[in-house]
C-alpha cells in the first residue's frame, strides 16, 4: 500500500527545512508518494488565498500532511481571512484535527543550552497534549459590545465564551491516557477548576475516563501551578493533557526548557489517525534563504508522522536515533551552536542525518 503524503512547505524557512525532511523520508525506501502544494503566503501570491481549494483537497485526500511554516511581515496588512496563518486554522478545521501532541525532550548534548540548570532539566522528556477545537478560542458568542448593565454599563467591553462539550473532553482525555500508557503511565490533567466552571467540568470528565485506565496514575494541577512546576521541577511530568488555551501557553513554556524551539516537532491528529505534522517554530522570515535554519524539528515531525499516522514505529525510531547520533557527533546549526561543536548549514545537517540513517 502506498501512503500519500501532502507536503506543504509554506513561507520563510519552510521550504528549506521541509526539503530536508523529504530527503529523510525518501531515504527510508518506503511506499510513500510525496506531493507538494502551496500554502500560506506562497499560496496567496499565486491564488490570492492562503489555503487554495487544490491544496485543501490534496490534504484531505492524503494519509498525512507534512507542514513547514507560514507567515511573513509583508502580509500583516492583509484582511485577517487572507493572512498566511489562516491556512493552518483552515486545515485544522477541515481535517477535524482535535489533538495536538508536542514532545519536549532535552537531548543530553544540548543541556547547556537550556534556560534552566542542567541538574534541574537533565533527562527532560514530556509530552504535552493540547485540545484544539474547543475552549475560549472557538466559543461563541464573542465580540465587542456596549455593556447593558453592571458596574460598567454604557462602556464598550470585549467578551469571549469558554466552553467544552462532553465528547470533546472525553476524546482528548483518552488520547492522554493512551499516550501515558505507552510511556511511563503518568498523566497530569491541567485545568483551573478552582475558578472556572468549564475546568471543573473538564476535571470531572477526566476522572470518569480514568476508570478505564486504572494502570495509569492520574493527577490534577491548576494551570498557574503547572506553569511554575515546569520551571521548578519539570521532570515530575510524563504526559500533560489540557485545554486549548492552557495548552497553547504551557507547550511554548516547555519548549524553552529544551534549549531551542528549532528542536521541537508536533503532531495534530483527528479521530481517524490522519495528522498534520509541523515544527513548533515559525517561518522566521528574517533568516529565510540563508541556509542556516535548523531542520531537525521538521525531521522529527516526519518521524512522528511515521509513528502516528502510518504506524511505522521502527522507521520512526530509526529517524530519531539518527538525530541523536548527529547531535552526539557535535554537529549544530546556528541556533544551537556553542564552543566545541561544529556549525553546519541546513543542508549539511540533512546530509548528516541521512548518513546516520545508514
Swiss-Prot record:
Q: Provide the cofactor note recorded for this chain's UniProt entry.
A: Binds 1 Mg(2+) or Mn(2+) ion per subunit.
Annotated Gene Ontology MF terms?
Answer: 3-isopropylmalate dehydrogenase activity; magnesium ion binding; NAD binding
**This protein's UniProt keywords:** Amino-acid biosynthesis, Branched-chain amino acid biosynthesis, Cytoplasm, Leucine biosynthesis, Magnesium, Manganese, Metal-binding, NAD, Oxidoreductase
Q: Which cofactor does it need?
A: Mg(2+); Mn(2+)
Binding residues annotated for substrate, in chain numbering: 92, 102, 130, 224
What's an example GO cellular component term for this entry?
Answer: cytosol
Q: What class of enzyme is it?
A: oxidoreductase
Per the record, the pathway is: Amino-acid biosynthesis; L-leucine biosynthesis; L-leucine from 3-methyl-2-oxobutanoate: step 3/4
The cross-references to Gene3D superfamilies, in alphabetical order and at most eight, read: Isopropylmalate Dehydrogenase
Q: What is its main location?
A: cytoplasm
- Taxonomically, the superkingdom here is Bacteria
- Listed Pfam families: Iso_dh
Q: Which GO terms describe its biological process?
A: L-leucine biosynthetic process
Per the record, where is site Important for catalysis? 137, 192
Report residues binding Mg(2+): 224, 248, 252
Where is NAD(+) annotated to bind?
282-294
Q: Cite the SUPFAM superfamilies for this sequence.
A: Isocitrate/Isopropylmalate dehydrogenase-like (SSF53659)
Q: Which HAMAP family match?
A: LeuB_type1 (MF_01033)
NCBIfam families the record matches: leuB
Protein function:
Catalyzes the oxidation of 3-carboxy-2-hydroxy-4-methylpentanoate (3-isopropylmalate) to 3-carboxy-4-methyl-2-oxopentanoate. The product decarboxylates to 4-methyl-2 oxopentanoate.
Record-stated family: Belongs to the isocitrate and isopropylmalate dehydrogenases family. LeuB type 1 subfamily.
Under the subunit heading, UniProt states: Homodimer.
What name does UniProt use for this protein? Answer: 3-isopropylmalate dehydrogenase
Q: Which organism is it from?
A: Bordetella pertussis (strain Tohama I / ATCC BAA-589 / NCTC 13251)
Amino acid at each position: 500500500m502506498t501512503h500519500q503524503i501532502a507536503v506543504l512547505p509554506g513561507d520563510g524557512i519552510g521550504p528549506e527545512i521541509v526539503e530536508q525532511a523529504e530527503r529523510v523520508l525518501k531515504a527510508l525506501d518506503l511506499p510513500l508518494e510525496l506531493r507538494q502544494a502551496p500554502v500560506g503566503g506562497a499560496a496567496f501570491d499565486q491564488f490570492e488565498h492562503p489555503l487554495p481549494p487544490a491544496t485543501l483537497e490534496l490534504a484531505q485526500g492524503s494519509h498525512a500532511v507534512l507542514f513547514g511554516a507560514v507567515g511573513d511581515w509583508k502580509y500583516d496588512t492583509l484582511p485577517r481571512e487572507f493572512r498566511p496563518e489562516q491556512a493552518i486554522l483552515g486545515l485544522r478545521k477541515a481535517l477535524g484535527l482535535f489533538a495536538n501532541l508536542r514532545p519536549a525532550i532535552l537531548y543530553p548534548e544540548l543541556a547547556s543550552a537550556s534556560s534552566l540548570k542542567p541538574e534541574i532539566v537533565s533527562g527532560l522528556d514530556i509530552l504535552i497534549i493540547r485540545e484544539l477545537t474547543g475552549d475560549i478560542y472557538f466559543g461563541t458568542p464573542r465580540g465587542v459590545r456596549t455593556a447593558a448593565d453592571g458596574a460598567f454599563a454604557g462602556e464598550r467591553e470585549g467578551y469571549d465564551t469558554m466552553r467544552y462539550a462532553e465528547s470533546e473532553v472525553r476524546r482528548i482525555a483518552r488520547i492522554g491516557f493512551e499516550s501515558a500508557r505507552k510511556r511511563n503511565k503518568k498523566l497530569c490533567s491541567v485545568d483551573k477548576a478552582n475558578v472556572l466552571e468549564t475546568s471543573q467540568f473538564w476535571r470531572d470528565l477526566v476522572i470518569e475516563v480514568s476508570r478505564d485506565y486504572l494502570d495509569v496514575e492520574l493527577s490534577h494541577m491548576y494551570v498557574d501551578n503547572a506553569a511554575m512546576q515546569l520551571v521548578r521541577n519539570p521532570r515530575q511530568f510524563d504526559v500533560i493533557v489540557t485545554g486549548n488555551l492552557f495548552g497553547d501557553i504551557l507547550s511554548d513554556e516547555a519548549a524553552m526548557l529544551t534549549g531551542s524551539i528549532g528542536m521541537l516537532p508536533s503532531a495534530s491528529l483527528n479521530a481517524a489517525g490522519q495528522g498534520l505534522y509541523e515544527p513548533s517554530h515559525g517561518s522566521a522570515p528574517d533568516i529565510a534563504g540563508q541556509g542556516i535554519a535548523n531542520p531537525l524539528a521538521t525531521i522529527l515531525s516526519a518521524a512522528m508522522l511515521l509513528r502516528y499516522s502510518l504506524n511505522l514505529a521502527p522507521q520512526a525510531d530509526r529517524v530519531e536515533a539518527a538525530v541523536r547520533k548527529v547531535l552526539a557527533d557535535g554537529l549544530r546549526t546556528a541556533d544551537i551552536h556553542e564552543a566545541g561543536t561544529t556549525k553546519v548549514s541546513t543542508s549539511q545537517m540533512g546530509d548528516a542525518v541521512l548518513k546516520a540513517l545508514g
